[in-house]
C-alpha cells in the first residue's frame, strides 16, 4: 500500500512523513508493518470516501502538503453510447450510472488495485452491495446500446465469472459461492436485474456477479464499460466519480454515456461539476475557534482535496 502511494506522490516521503501527514489530516492509523514492503493500515470513514484507494490518499496528501493544487474537476469526453433502463428494474434495483473508460494501460498491479478498491467499496461502504454494486467489463465483445432490465430468474442463464458451465440465475443463488454470499439482496424478488447488450448477451446479474464471457477483465484490455447500480442516483454518481478519478490517474480517458429512462422521460449523464460552497471568513473562524486572516483561509481551503469549490466571502 505504501509503495502504491509513493508511485503517485509529487515528492519522495518517508513512511514516517506519510504517517504524520495522515494523522495531521485526521486519519485513523491502525498500524504499520515493519518489513521492507511496508504497509499502512488506515481506517477510511464515509466522509473521506474519495480516499478509498491509494491513489486517492496520495492525491489528498499532495494537496494537504501543498505539493499540488487540489483536483476540482475531471476531464470528460462527451460520448454517444447509451444504457437504456427498462421500467422492469423499478422495484428491484432502479438506478444505474455509467461511463466508458478508454486507452487504459493495464498491468497486473493496476488491475489488482482496481479489484481491491471495488471490493473495499462493496464491503466497507455499500452494505455488501446493497447500496451500490460496481460492474466493470471489457467493451471489445459488447454491442451497444446496453440494456438494464429485469427478468424472471428462470429466464436468466449465462456462465458466471470463474465458472466452467452456464447456469440459470436460480442455480447461481443456490450453488455459486459468490452468488450465495449476496443472495439475500434478491430474496423475495420476482424478477432479477441484468445488464445485456444489443445482441442479448448478458453482461452481469447485479449485485451478484459478472458473466465470464463478457465481464472478465484482463491486463490487455484497454477500453472498459463501468457501471454502478443501486437505489440512489446521487450516491451512485459519487461512487462512479471515485472510480473515474482513480482510473484517470492510471492514464485512462473517460467518456460519458447517456443513461436513458424512457419510462420516466429522463436521461442521466455523469456529473463531474464540483460542489460549490459559499462561506464567510467569520463563519469559518467561528467553527475552528481561531480568528483567521484572509490568506490563512485561502491556504487552508487549498489543502482540501476533492471535487469541491469554496466561494469564500472575505
What does each of the following model-derived ranges do?
Residues 1-314:
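RNA/tRNA-interacting regions in translation and RNA-turnover enzymes
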Amino acid at each position: 500500500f505504501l509503495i502504491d502511494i509513493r508511485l503517485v506522490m509529487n515528492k519522495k516521503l518517508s513512511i514516517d512523513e506519510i504517517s504524520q501527514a495522515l494523522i495531521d489530516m485526521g486519519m485513523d492509523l491502525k498500524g504499520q508493518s515493519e518489513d521492507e514492503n511496508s504497509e499502512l493500515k488506515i481506517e477510511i470513514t464515509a466522509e473521506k470516501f474519495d480516499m478509498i484507494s491509494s491513489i486517492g490518499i496520495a492525491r489528498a496528501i499532495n494537496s494537504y502538503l501543498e505539493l499540488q493544487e487540489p483536483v476540482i474537476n475531471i476531464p470528460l469526453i462527451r460520448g454517444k453510447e447509451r444504457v437504456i433502463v427498462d421500467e422492469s428494474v423499478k422495484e428491484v434495483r432502479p438506478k444505474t450510472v455509467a461511463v466508458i473508460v478508454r486507452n487504459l494501460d493495464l498491468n497486473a498491479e493496476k488491475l489488482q488495485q482496481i479489484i481491491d478498491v471495488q471490493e473495499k467499496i462493496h464491503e466497507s461502504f455499500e452494505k455488501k452491495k446493497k447500496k451500490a454494486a460496481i460492474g466493470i467489463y471489457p467493451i471489445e465483445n459488447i454491442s451497444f446500446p446496453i440494456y438494464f432490465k429485469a427478468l424472471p430468474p428462470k429466464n436468466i442463464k449465462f456462465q458466471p465469472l470463474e465458472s466452467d458451465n452456464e447456469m440459470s440465475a436460480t442455480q447461481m443463488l443456490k450453488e455459486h459461492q459468490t452468488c450465495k454470499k449476496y443472495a439475500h439482496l434478491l430474496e423475495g424478488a420476482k424478477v432479477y436485474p441484468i445488464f445485456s447488450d444489443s445482441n442479448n448477451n448478458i453482461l452481469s446479474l447485479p449485485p451478484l456477479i459478472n458473466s465470464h464471457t463478457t465481464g472478465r477483465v484482463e491486463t490487455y484490455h484497454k477500453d472498459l464499460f463501468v457501471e454502478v447500480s443501486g437505489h440512489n442516483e446521487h450516491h451512485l454518481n459519487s461512487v462512479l466519480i471515485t472510480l473515474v478519478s482513480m482510473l484517470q490517474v492510471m492514464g485512462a480517458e473517460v467518456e460519458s454515456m447517456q443513461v436513458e429512462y424512457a419510462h420516466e422521460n429522463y436521461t442521466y449523464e455523469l456529473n463531474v461539476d464540483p460542489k460549490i460552497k459559499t462561506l464567510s471568513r467569520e463563519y469559518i473562524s467561528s467553527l475552528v475557534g481561531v480568528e483567521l486572516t484572509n490568506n490563512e483561509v485561502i491556504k487552508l481551503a487549498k489543502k482540501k482535496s476533492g471535487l469541491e469549490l469554496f466561494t469564500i466571502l472575505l
